Regions:
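Glycine-rich, positively charged N-terminal anion/phosphate-binding segment
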Residues: 1-4, 9, 18-94
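Alpha/beta catalytic cores of nucleotide-metabolism and tRNA/nucleoside-modifying enzymes
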Residues: 1-4, 9-13, 19, 24-25, ...
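Hydrophobic faces of well-ordered beta-strands that scaffold small-molecule active sites
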Residues: 13-17, 38-40, 68-72, 96, ...
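Active-site beta-loop-alpha junctions enriched in small/polar residues
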Residues: 18-20, 43-45, 73-75, 101-103, ...
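Short, solvent-exposed helix-helix connector turns and helix-capping sites enriched
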Residues: 52-53, 116-120, 192, 241-242, ...
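Short glycine-enriched, charge-decorated loop/helix-capping segments at active-site entrances
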Residues: 57, 111-117, 185, 250-252
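Alpha/beta enzyme core
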Residues: 81-112, 120-207
């Protein structure tokens, strides 16, 4: 599979863009675990134009994580065009991705993210403006099946996402990622891959189609490639507390000790990138969500302790207690 001139190999697996999750430290860790391409947290176009330091910091990229995509969002043509130029000039990403899928109220409720699905003409104008503004960088889009269930099909019976995919391709995108839910669903229920498959199997489409939604096992990955024919799959929430998932999805296995050591490395990376207090604050909720801790006796109390830890020493002591307990249980 290729996005522009970037060869991503056969059946690649991507790390999804996630706010307050996919910072450079986490991206590097997932890359080490086998992610083919990684995506940044989304960045506000308005904030980039205003040169807000917090948003500019999200443009930090290192060579070891390439190929890497930086994702931007917004609802103004001029702002998105200018933000795209800033991203390309400062970060030199391999791919520039446009977020037309974020369902959270503070984004979609203001007309950005998945809110753009209610204004397709503007969505297309933004996409074309960005693609024209950065012709040497592949522009891609991440979106959802539609705004809500009533809007899944056009009056003539054509699936909304099939029509949108064609129109996005026509204005210059070089790959399309589709999350298999509507905005109204948020993250409830199961992702519907049937419509993703219809986009991929549309003879008009020639750009890569990347499927996203409920990817957590190697069996599911196999089904998505074989049954729906997508060119790549993208993993999001299943990476929480489980950055090694990419190795597992490719058929690899890790011991309990290896998994716990990876979580400790995530702590170290977070602290080194920021500082001890803020690094711990950022990473501890990821550790508390790790599936390897589920099922141990009285984990609720242990989880609370983990979420209250303020130093590396304190957090590591809790992790080692859990390691010993898990070994005893096994």
């Amino acid at each position: 599979m290729k996005i522009g001139n970037i060869d991503l190999g056969h059946e690649p697996i991507f790390l999804a863009p996630m706010e307050d999750v996919t910072d450079i430290g986490f991206r590097l860790l997932c890359k080490q675990m086998g992610a083919t391409m990684v995506y940044s947290e989304f960045v506000s176009s308005d904030a980039l134009i205003r040169m807000v330091n917090k948003s500019l910091a999200k443009l930090q990229v290192c060579e070891d994580e390439r190929p890497v995509a930086i994702q931007i969002y917004g609802k103004d043509v001029d702002a998105m065009r200018e933000a795209a130029r800033i991203v390309v000039d400062q970060a030199h990403p391999d791919v520039l991705d446009l977020n037309f899928g974020c369902p959270v109220r503070k984004v979609a409720g203001k007309g950005a993210g998945s809110g753009m699905l209610q204004n397709v003409p503007l969505l297309l104008d933004i996409t074309k403006a960005v693609a024209d503004a950065v012709p040497d960088t592949p522009v891609t889009v991440k979106t959802r099946l539609g705004w809500d269930t009533p809007g899944l099909y056009l009056p003539d019976g054509t699936p909304f996402i099939v029509d949108l995919a064609e129109r996005l391709q026509d204005v210059g995108i070089q790959a399309l990622t589709i999350h298999g839910r509507t905005r109204a669903q948020m993250y409830q229920g199961e992702a519907d891959w049937t419509l993703i498959g219809e986009v991929k199997n549309n003879p008009r489409m020639h750009i890569p189609i990347i499927g996203n939604g409920d990817i957590s096992t190697k069996e599911r990955v196999r089904e998505c490639f074989d049954r729906y024919g997508v060119d790549a799959v993208m993993v999001g929430r299943a990476t929480f507390g489980r950055p090694w998932i990419f190795r597992e999805l490719q058929g690899g296995t890790l011991s309990l000790d290896e998994k716990i050591d990876i979580l400790k490395q995530q702590v170290i990376t977070s602290v080194e990138r920021i500082d001890e207090y803020r690094g711990i604050l950022h990473v501890r909720r990821h550790l508390a969500a790790s599936p390897i801790f589920k099922g141990i006796p009285n984990f609720r109390e242990t989880r609370i302790k983990m979420l209250r830890a303020e130093t590396v020493e304190e957090l590591f002591a809790i992790i080692e207690e859990i390691r010993a307990l898990l070994k005893t249980e096994n």
